[in-house]
A protein has these predicted regions:
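Beta1-alpha1 glycine-rich phosphate/pyrophosphate-binding loop at the start
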Residues: 6-33, 62-74, 83-85, 112, ...
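A conserved FAD-binding loop/helix module that cradles the flavin
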Residues: 300, 443-469
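Residue-level detector of alpha-helix initiation sites
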Residues: 89, 155-156, 294-296, 443-444
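Ferredoxin-type iron-sulfur electron-transfer modules in oxidoreductases and energy-metabolism complexes
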Residues: 24-42, 64-96, 113-143, 268
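Glycine-rich dinucleotide-binding loop and its adjacent helix/turn
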Residues: 126-143, 204-221, 244-307, 416-428, ...
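FAD-site-proximal beta/loop scaffold in flavoenzymes
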Residues: 253-285, 370-447
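Local cysteine-cluster metal-coordination motifs and their immediate loop/turn environment
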Residues: 45-64, 89-112
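Feature captures the FAD/FMN-dependent oxidoreductase FAD-binding
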Residues: 79, 143-152, 200-249, 348-357, ...
Length: 470
């Protein structure tokens, strides 16, 4: 690192360049250009190497951020990537999709006055560069056991669990209903944030490490849970949350109203040129209204732009300051032509004489007293009802645990919201009420960040290792 203690002043924060707007609006490719070696080195040099690194503590997996920034600054990429993998199973993913402004970069000492260190982009640079250099995990010292674990779900929690298990000599076999690994990383997050080749490469890495993938396999249909319990020493549930939430709006089942996840999955199948048993949902030429204010809503509005929608509106019931989505994603959406309408609460879906969507009836809101979560409640403004014209409406209200009938006979307790009970403060962390079954990620904590799912998958794997006495 630089000996100049004022390097953070001499070198200002610089984010990667973005592709031109006219290209971004039509292509499903990542919008950020990669850092050059010179850019990554200079930006890493801005780190103050704080004695108490708030960035590290704010990170859910507690990455060794100052240490790998120093290694990146010195050009020691292979050492940096080894260090990043000590805490994170998918650093190239987190570097792309984590809301760094709310996590590591938001906690950076330099953030308020000088601009935070570009931690996420350097994390991405380190891993991408290491893969270019031919890096792969060294498995030569692994002492293999005769233990094997079935992992249900190839999303971030399942992949993280597989990573820890295989590094400790336990054979992970991952089952997933989709044709490619990643879960919503692949089929939910659009390519302009996370290109599909990223997960394809990670699949090759995990396979070479000894992880076995059995794709296009639906538990409860293609394989039974009892078979897995009989054949494997333990089972990990990393099934995520796939039930999309509804608002109970009038006419929300009308033709032209879509839930966010089926819309995004449909688009991914088309982008990846995969066969799909559902028709493609196309927004070309349509006036689209997306209801919601989280990252999924941002994915929907930006996907609609790329599909060629004539007009795209994001309607959210609170103000911009209270949007749950990443500020970076909101900014990108605005640049690409999305119109945001804040303090609007949907009341119902308007339909024409044929029953098809013609608009969304909304009411203006004002923020009132805080709710139990500390967020100010949106309160309707009397007499402010009006209609937003629309040919298509996408509802992006979030996700909740989906029903798993195949799990019911196996004494796995759920909480009142349908989440799997798998406490982390017990003898074997993330063990369920069935001693042989462990769980982690969104299925346990509810819909959350990729990095929190990774964290729980890794910790659940540690619990499994202790349970198996490995």
């Amino acid at each position: 690192m630089s000996q100049n203690v004022y390097q953070f002043i001499d070198v200002q924060r610089v984010d990667p360049a973005k592709k031109p707007i006219k290209i971004r609006k039509i292509e499903f490719v990542e919008i950020y250009e990669p850092f050059t070696k010179q850019q990554a080195t200079a930006q890493a040099d801005r780190c103050l190497d704080c004695g108490n690194p708030y960035c590290e503590w704010k990170c859910p997996v507690h990455n060794y951020i100052p240490q790998w920034l120093k290694l990146a600054n010195e050009g020691r990429i292979l050492e940096a990537v080894e260090l990043s993998h000590q805490t994170n199973s998918l650093p190239e993913v987190c570097g792309r999709v984590c809301p760094q402004d709310r996590l590591c970069e938001g906690s950076c000492t330099l953030n308020d006055d000088f601009g935070a260190v570009t931690i996420g982009n350097i994390e991405k640079y380190i891993t991408d560069k290491a893969f270019e250099m031919g890096w792969k995990p060294d498995m030569s010292k692994v002492e293999w056991t005769d233990k094997k674990v079935a992992i249900i779900g190839a999303g971030p929690a399942g992949l993280a669990a597989a990573d820890i298990l295989v590094r400790n000599g336990v054979k992970p076999v991952v089952f997933d209903r989709y044709p490619e690994i990643g879960g919503l990383l692949t089929f939910g997050i659009p390519s302009f944030k996370l290109e599909k080749g990223v997960m394809e490469n990670r699949r090759r890495v995990f396979t070479e490490m000894g992880v076995e993938f059995r794709m296009n396999v639906e538990v409860g249909q293609d394989v039974q849970m009892q078979e897995l319990l009989d054949e494997y020493d333990a089972v990990f549930l990393g099934v995520g949350t796939y039930k999309y939430m509804r608002a109970g709006l009038e006419n929300e089942d009308a033709p032209g109203v879509y839930d966010a996840l089926p819309f995004l999955i449909s688009n991914t199948y088309k982008v990846m040129e995969l066969e799909h048993n559902q028709p493609f949902i196309d927004m070309a030429g349509k006036k689209v209204v997306v209801l919601g204010g989280g990252d999924t809503a941002m994915d929907c509005v930006r996907t609609s732009i790329r599909q060629g929608a004539s007009n795209v509106i994001c309607a959210y019931r609170r103000d911009e300051e209270n949007m749950p989505g990443s500020r970076r994603e909101v900014k990108n959406a605005k640049e690409e032509g999305v119109k945001f309408m804040f303090n609007l609460q949907p009341l119902g879906i308007e339909v024409d004489a044929y029953g098809k969507v013609s608009g969304v009836k909304v009411v203006k809101t004002a923020l009132g007293e805080p709710d139990d979560a500390g967020r100010r409640r949106p309160e309707p403004v009397e007499g402010s009802e009006h209609v937003l014209p629309a040919d298509a409406v996408i509802m992006a209200f979030g996700f909740q645990p989906h029903q798993m009938n195949w799990l019911t006979p196996f004494n796995v307790e759920l909480d009142q919201w349908g989440r799997i009970k798998a406490p982390n403060n017990q003898e074997f962390q993330y063990q369920t009420s069935n001693e042989k079954i462990f769980a982690g990620g969104d299925a346990v904590r509810g819909s959350d960040l990729v990095v929190t799912a990774i964290d729980e998958g890794r910790k659940a794997a540690e619990g499994i290792l202790e349970y198996l006495n490995v």
